[in-house]
Amino acid sequence: MNQKQEALLGLPLTNAEREWLTDRLETLSVKESYQLSAAIMRSGRLQELVGKSRDELQATVLRMKPDVAVEAINCLMTLHDYEVCYPAGSYDALGRFFLQYESGAPRDTLPFVDLDQLGRRYEDLHPGLFIGGSYVVYPTKEPEQHYTGHNLAELDDSDWSVRLKIASPEKPEGVWVRLPDYSMVNDDKADEVELALLDLKVDTIQDCTLLDARCILPEVENLVSEYHELADLIYDGNDLGFLLDEQGQGMPHFNEKFHAALAYEKCTRLGAALDIAQNLRCYDFVPREDVESFAEKFLESRGIEAGHVSLLSECMDRESYRRYLLAQQGYQQHAASGSFIRRNQLDFCYERSQPPTPQAHFEMKL
């Protein structure tokens, strides 16, 4: 570590670091709490983060030294490197888990397998920790260190779609769920929702109450009031997660276009956001990186020779002309990204939301 890094780590925690750590620790899902416990047991450090109430966590973060904060943030950024196997609270159960979900062997193999021995061999090949009725597999290599002590704003904590806090009569204070839940695409292998239900001591989502909900899309507000059924919110939260994973199946500038479309439509509801994501073809889009050359490309599209376009560009107010063309063609600027967007004439398919009234659509276009 060089002198500059040592000096940075010697400074008190910034407000941003405290807020990041407090929020991340307060919203840990049940699955993530298993992963964090395994990470801490593996390293033998950060014991102060385990088993704390909200107030205790805040006090812990306030007392935290900068070098510990850096380690804690890096640990929290790499929880996904720890695989949670459930149910697998014993060697016998771990062997059964492997046989059912990972081996590919037919079901009629089960009576002939020594599950305890299989579980122990699995542990030999995949070192980990038994915790909470699960087996958490350690990463095969040291997790990448994302945080250096001064790049908090650059950290990419975006591998989620919706966070839910759900409660049960047995646990009225509730637990967090971090969507998407991948059980449906992983042969029903237990994931976020099932682990939360286990902790809440209930059998189904219908036995739970929604206490809080947060969406990764800053445009989307008040999920609790938008959804009357928790199962519907989980379904849509999963769909958003899968959609963000796919990135429009390789669509160029997907995130930039998606957020520009959300702003263009003044979208504040998750259902409408999902419809917009499925209908991005209905928007013409000029990404920020193409804005500067928009005027030149327009002139070229009119059949003007490249040499003449270059000459005109040298002798005109390019920025004013560019803005004139964009406005004339009905584009609106997305302030956050600097890109431009407009609706085209393709039919928009509404599945989770209602089309705007003619008056509302007219006002939106003004």
Locations of regions flagged by a protein language model:
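Mixed-charge (acidic/basic) macromolecular-recognition segments
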Residues: 2-112, 116-120, 134-159, 172, ...
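Short, surface-exposed polybasic-aromatic patches that bind anionic ligands, especially phosphate groups
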Residues: 123-124, 130-132, 319-329, 334-336, ...
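Non-Sec secretion/translocation targeting segments of pathogen effectors
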Residues: 114, 317, 352-366
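Generic recognition of long tandem-repeat/solenoid scaffolds
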Residues: 137-138, 340-342
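Short coil/turn segments at secondary-structure boundaries
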Residues: 310, 337-338
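A short beta-strand micro-motif
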Residues: 161-169
